[in-house]
């Protein structure tokens, strides 16, 4: 079956959990979390869960695993904590949970960021994607620009297709 055929069979609506990772954001100031919600809704997807967690490995893992265990969540989208500072532990937290890494997500995100957005600073991004069982997790930087780029160029065009692939036998 071709990629085109897979995409035709893919679900049009995917159920998502948004996790913002920040020591300072609130629901009122979480611009990237709000942007994720808007972009998903505009694309016909549903946000079934949203939370803000602190920049610590245990809190991040608990939030991601809570999404994994929910029947009304197909995808967990995290934003924040993907840089190289001491407090940036999202990648360490999420990668330890992944069964399979979607290596192309991070590679393409950095390439597009380099070419279309922030130039050589793209090398500082540690965005990651992968699967836990039949769920997919994408971890992207916390800036609204990075979220918009990741969602519009990579995640939204493939969200239904990825979900379809994870449920094939």
Curated annotation (Swiss-Prot):
- Which Gene3D superfamilies does UniProt cross-reference here? MoaB/Mog-like domain
- Give the record's keywords alphabetically: Molybdenum cofactor biosynthesis
Task: Write down a Pfam family by its short name.
Answer: MoCF_biosynth
From the UniProt record, give the pathway where this protein acts. Answer: Cofactor biosynthesis; molybdopterin biosynthesis
**SMART domains documented for this protein:** MoCF_biosynth (SM00852)
Task: Tell me where on the tree of life, at the top rank, the source sits.
Answer: Bacteria
GO aspect biological process, one term: Mo-molybdopterin cofactor biosynthetic process
Q: Which GO terms describe its cellular component?
A: cytosol
> What does the function comment of this entry state?
May be involved in the biosynthesis of molybdopterin.
User: PANTHER family recorded for this chain?
Assistant: MOLYBDENUM COFACTOR BIOSYNTHESIS PROTEIN B
Family affiliation: Belongs to the MoaB/Mog family.
Q: Would you tell me the protein name for this molecule?
A: Molybdenum cofactor biosynthesis protein B
Tell me which species this is from.
Bacillus anthracis
Q: Which gene encodes it?
A: moaB
